[in-house]
Amino acid sequence: LYKDVSNVPDLEIVKLSRELKIDIAIDLKGHTLNSKTKLFAYRMAPIQINYLGYPGSLGTSFIDYIIADKILIPDSESKHYSEKIIYLPNSYQPNDNQREISKIETKKEDFDFPENSLILSCLNSTYKITPDELEIWSRILEKTNNTYLWLLDTNKQGKNNLINFFKNKNIDIKRIKFAENLSHSCHLERLRHSDVFLDTFNVNAHTTCSDALWVGVPVVTKQGK
């Protein structure tokens, strides 16, 4: 049974869930933009679970479980979760193993990279990037030649802030490239030009990381907290 409730008032959604006698309700967004976590406070189902979209604890009494793995929540960090933890083996994250990669092949030069350049990419949203990562990336660029940093062009202010940071570090701005929004299949195809994907630390990559791994790009990360 599928019900489209995207335009239904919140309390009507709660009422409908109770009428349908849903056994388990899963919050796939958590504390993220345009989420509906507040509906779970009304108890839409006897069992309510936090999963996938927000891997941190929701810190509430109305979410009973979180689905995770040992990388996402090591035993040492479980004390920080209000939810009981359901551990899946290996990875908690389901991925589409049939993601389409565009058959229209591109070259590095199509994205303004020299043919023999080394491309370090971080295509996470800019809000995830902190001064810690920027300092590390700056040192890499200072100590290497023909290395380029590929970032996501998410908004004008974020882009300008990043450019100004590297200018203040005396980094040649021509070595900082910004990836525009493309269709997912075209994005996957261009991502293959990256040599290494550099993750952010406080908020790690999610879909962007699985995309990189899907097209064979190694990921360098650090477990966040």
At which residue positions do the language-model features occur?
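Conserved nucleotide-cofactor-binding alpha/beta core module
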Residues: L1-F62, K70-S78, L149-K225
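A generic secondary-structure signal marking the coil-to-beta-strand transition
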Residues: I47, D64, K84, N116-I119
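Conserved catalytic-core segment of nucleotide-activated headgroup transferases in glycan assembly
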Residues: N90-S183, R190
